[in-house]
Design a protein with these regions (language model features):
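Conserved acidic donor-binding segment of nucleotide-sugar-dependent glycosyltransferases
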Residues: 166-167, 171-178, 187-192
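Acidic donor-binding loop of glycosyltransferase active sites
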Residues: 122-136, 149
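Nucleotide-activated donor-binding/catalytic signature segment of Leloir-type glycosyltransferases, i.e.
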Residues: 93-112
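Short hydrophobic beta-strand element within catalytic cores of glycosyltransferases
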Residues: 150-154
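Conserved donor-binding/catalytic core segment of Leloir-type glycosyltransferases
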Residues: 38-70, 81
Length: 254
């Protein structure tokens, strides 16, 4: 079983299926290798926070507006860019407007091409990934990390446990805990050195491990081992095609 979500192995284990036969997988959008990741991060707008996706309840874009309110009340200098459209758009704009944040601190940029989204990721210092357990993977996380963003990611989304090592290449928070999300965003706004460190480590995570090239090579090695009847559980220590063990729903402890 190739698990394109960190929760897949655990879901199947509940039915007694694929014991020790689950391997980590994922979605692999285009990987961009920049001439200098240091130069890219240096050019980023450190006070710019980006969110991208459909405006749906299980993606929790409203949590971003709530964080914006708290940042504003705390006197933080910031700008949030929201890319996307969806059923919550009117509600979100109303929330931002009522808080006096619309256009000043929170901008809604509408839908745009994947290429344009990547340009915004390359410019933003921080990226918020707020989806809950209904997000099977979330390829925007790969893209934001590839773009050198310091990510703050919900622990509940399927990609987060595989891609984000909390405190090393990004931050993880408990889905729905707005105060925790706010605290981690504010810490990054106030500590640009941490932004740089997380962003560079995130970039290396994607370019050196979690990408299509590595996944394809490892898939061939894994397939050959399985066809030969070889124990493949220790073939790779981590990353694509490494053994995927059942993950507890409450795996993330702050």
């Amino acid at each position: 079983m190739l698990c394109a979500s960190a929760y897949t192995a655990g879901d199947y284990a509940k039915f007694g299926l694929f014991h020790n036969r689950c391997y980590k997988w994922g979605y692999f959008p285009e990987t961009i290798r920049y001439p200098s990741i240091d130069d890219l991060i240096d050019r980023k707008a450190k006070a710019t926070i980006l969110w991208c996706g459909r405006f749906l309840d299980w993606k929790h874009p409203d949590d971003v507006i709530e964080v914006a309110k708290r940042l504003h009340e705390a006197g933080c200098c910031f700008k949030i860019e929201m890319i996307g459209t969806g059923e919550m758009e009117r509600q979100l704009k109303q929330q931002a407007s009522e808080a006096g944040l619309l256009d000043e601190n929170v901008r809604f940029l509408g839908a745009m091409s994947p290429e344009a989204v990547r340009r915004h990721m390359e410019s933003a210092g921080i990226y918020l990934f707020t989806s809950d357990r209904q997000e099977g993977w979330g390829a925007v996380l790969n893209e934001a990390m590839n773009s050198g963003c310091a990510v703050v990611a919900s622990y509940a989304a399927g990609a987060t446990p595989y891609l984000v090592n909390d405190g090393v290449n990004g931050s993880v928070y408990h889905s729905g805990n707005i105060q925790e999300l706010y605290e981690k965003v504010r810490r990054l706004l106030e500590n640009t050195t941490m932004q740089y460190s997380f962003g560079k480590a995130a970039y290396l995570t994607i370019t050196e491990l979690w990408n299509a090239e590595v996944a394809a090579k490892r898939f061939l090695q894994l397939s050959q081992a399985l066809l030969n009847g070889t124990d493949a559980s220790g073939l790779f220590a981590n990353g694509p095609c490494s053994l995927a063990k059942p993950l507890r729903e409450d795996w993330y402890q702050r």
